[in-house]
Design a protein with these regions (language model features):
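Divalent metal-cofactor coordination and adjacent catalytic microenvironments
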Residues: 1-283
Length: 283
C-alpha cells in the first residue's frame, strides 16, 4: 500500500525543519507511521482499486468498501462467476447503528427485497467476486480527494516518473494524488516538477493530457494528526533514546510505556490516546 497520512511538509512544520537534508528519512518515517496506523486500526485509509473474493453468504461482511464496480457470484461452485448483480439487488450498510444506511465506508451488504437473488451464493466457498474501490478514505465521500492543480505538460509515457504542474502550493512529498484514473505517490518536488511512483494502489499507469486536473487524497483529520504525532516522535526518538516528553514551540507530546515496551510502547501510547475509535474488530 502506497501512501502517508501526513505529508512531509506537515511533519517538518511541527519539527521546525526547513532544510531538505532529512526529507527522505522523514518521508519513510511518515510511511512507517501510516502502516502502524493501519495495523493498529485493522483497516487502511488509503484507497485501493482491487478485485476481492469472499465465501458466499446471505449477508456479506466486508473490509472497508467505498465503491462497487462489479459484484458477481458463483452459485454452483464451478469457479465461474455467472451472476452479475445490479445496484438494486443489494443494500449497502456502513458503520454505526442508527444511520448505517447513510455512512461510508460500506462494511456490510444484504440482499434487497426485490432482488433477483436470494443470497450472495450462500454456502459456496469463494462464491463472491467484488471489484471496487477499497479503503476507509476520509470517511465521508466515495471520492475522498480534492481538486488542487493541473498538468502543464501531457504525460505521454507509461514509465515517466515526473510530471509538471501549474502550482505546488498545497503539494508535498508523501502525498497520494489522482490524475484521471491513475493514483501516483509523490517522492519529491523540485520547483514545479513532481517525482512520483506511477500506478499505485491497484491503479494502472496511463497517459494524461495537458491541463488534466490533479487531485489530492484526503484522510480523517484525527488520522492525519496521529500520523504527524507518531512521525515526530519516531524522528525525535532516533537521537533521544529514553525521552518520554518534549516540547517544540507550541507542540508537545508525552509518551507512556516507552521504557518498558520500546518502540511498540511509543506507537501504542500515541495511537491509544488519539484514534482508538477508528479501530475495527477483525472478522
Amino acid at each position: 500500500m502506497f501512501g502517508s497520512y501526513a505529508s512531509i511538509a506537515d511533519v517538518k512544520g511541527v519539527l521546525g525543519i526547513t532544510a531538505t537534508t532529512d526529507d527522505v528519512t522523514i518521508r519513510k518515517i511518515a510511511e512507517a507511521a501510516s502502516r502502524s496506523i493501519d495495523n493498529y486500526c485493522n483497516r487502511h485509509f488509503a484507497t485501493q482499486s482491487a478485485t476481492k473474493y469472499f465465501d458466499g453468504a446471505r449477508a456479506l461482511w466486508l473490509p472497508d468498501l467505498l465503491d462497487i464496480t462489479t459484484l458477481k457470484t458463483d452459485e454452483d461452485g464451478d469457479a465461474t462467476f455467472e451472476n452479475t448483480f445490479v445496484t438494486t439487488d443489494y443494500i449497502k450498510y456502513g458503520h454505526g447503528l442508527e444511520d448505517s444506511l447513510n455512512t461510508l465506508p460500506t462494511t456490510r451488504l444484504e440482499i434487497s427485497h426485490d432482488s433477483d437473488y436470494g443470497s450472495f451464493a450462500s454456502g459456496v466457498k469463494k462464491g463472491v467476486e467484488i471489484a471496487g474501490l477499497w479503503g476507509y478514505g476520509d470517511g465521508i465521500s466515495a471520492t475522498p480527494y480534492v481538486l488542487d492543480t493541473t498538468l502543464t505538460a501531457a504525460i505521454t509515457s507509461l514509465t515517466a516518473l515526473t510530471c509538471a504542474v501549474t502550482a505546488v502550493t498545497n503539494l508535498s512529498a508523501g502525498q497520494t494524488i489522482l490524475i484521471d484514473t491513475e493514483q501516483m505517490y509523490i517522492y519529491s518536488i523540485a520547483t514545479l516538477t513532481l517525482t512520483v511512483e506511477r500506478g499505485v494502489n491497484g491503479t494502472d499507469a496511463a497517459t494524461h493530457l495537458i491541463n488534466a486536473p490533479l487531485y489530492i487524497y484526503q484522510y480523517p483529520s484525527d488520522i492525519r494528526q496521529a500520523c504527524i504525532d507518531l512521525s515526530v516522535a519516531l524522528y525525535q526518538l532516533r537521537n533521544k533514546k529514553g525521552v518520554q516528553s518534549e516540547k517544540i514551540g507550541d507542540y508537545s507530546y508525552t509518551l507512556t510505556n516507552v521504557t518498558a515496551q520500546g518502540q511498540k510502547g511509543l506507537i501504542e501510547s500515541i495511537l491509544d490516546s488519539s484514534i482508538r475509535s477508528y479501530k475495527r474488530m477483525r472478522f
